[in-house]
Amino acid sequence: MSNFDLSCSKNFITIEEQEELSQLAVDYLQQGVLQANPRGPHRYRAKIWGTEYCTPIIMKIGKRIIEHFKIKGCPVDPHLGWIISLIEKGGQIHKHRDKYAYHEQNNVKHLRCNIMVTRENSTANPVIEGRIIDVPARAIWGFIPSESEHSTQLVDVEKPRIVYQFGFVVPMDYTLPVN
């Protein structure tokens, strides 16, 4: 295991926001907005940045993320943007790093800020550099996914794990805020 930078803050969204975001993800799954992820079974996602699916509540939370992570003026990541991720029982995210030519060619880093909207138990926790990170519901965690291998355990839940992911382009000298 190697060291990695991580910022995690509890209660980033309210209970009301949690309920609205959870219902929105479930509705989007039922409407076919969230598509099966080709990287594994029981995984669904939708890139929502710049689409009609990026609702006012998502934009409001995005602004709060910009303030929290002190990234005013940093653009939304052009490769992954903002994503809704839903994983059902038996799904998992494989170990990987998010390395894209855009970031290397432009000498920038990709900051990913994730909100744990729903998690039924600890199998929903992210794994970063081989360490299980305890992220409670309504918390946000941010890290540089091109520098840290990340994944999940096999998700064992009755209700899906729902995470909203907000990606930004930050300068190479960017450091995560200390909690």
Segments (PLM) and residue ranges:
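A short beta-loop-beta micro-motif enriched in histidine and acidic residues
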Residues: 78-79, 94-112
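A short glycine-rich, His/Asp/Glu-containing loop-to-beta-strand
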Residues: 71-95
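A general secondary-structure signal for short beta-strands and their flanking turns/coil
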Residues: 6, 110, 159-161
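Nucleic-acid-interacting cores, centered on viral/eukaryotic replication and modification enzymes
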Residues: 83, 91-93, 100, 129, ...
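Short, conserved beta-strand element in jelly-roll/cupin
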Residues: 86-88, 104-122, 167
